[in-house]
Amino acid sequence: ILNQFISFMRDGSDEEPQETNVNTLLQELVTQFKPLDIRFTPQELPLIQARSMSLKRLIGNLINNSKRYGAEPVELSAQIEQDRLLIKVADHGEGIPEDQIEDLMQPFVRGNSARTVQGSGLGLAIVKRIVDIHSGELYIHNGPEGGLEAIISLPIHQAEPEQTATPTTLDKIRQSITGHF
């Protein structure tokens, strides 16, 4: 749990944005998670400005959640819609009760069915934080035929991800703990 908490505090806001090939990043994750059955077909995508390591961590967390709480195969895709890059991670598990989805993006919150699986309750909070740093949006919902779908929507035509004053680690710890005690 301590490692997850430290990971939550290191949200990537200090990482420099760089040109990122999303297809390459996704293919690296497919390889990293072998032998997990991940279905991914690269599409023609532009390079985007992103914090590459943080983006990889974000998508890796979603794949890991699919592995732990969902069922194979995991479907991974990226496509352009209007001026947005949409990255989707979907599994074929049971999904999550709709009334729990929003709460799961808060630190230390776990779903009812996840209580039998070891975890910290920080995975989706880390995902949400990294999406916010990239000026993106995160949509999580149950798929029409079961399973859970997470869609990350990132702007394509931005100079670079959101620049905010980087809080110190102590500030982050205070902010995170204050809301939970």
Language-model segments: residues:
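Short alpha-helical Gxxx[C/S/T] motif in the catalytic ATP-binding
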Residues: G123, V127
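Conserved glycine-rich
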Residues: E72, S135-G136
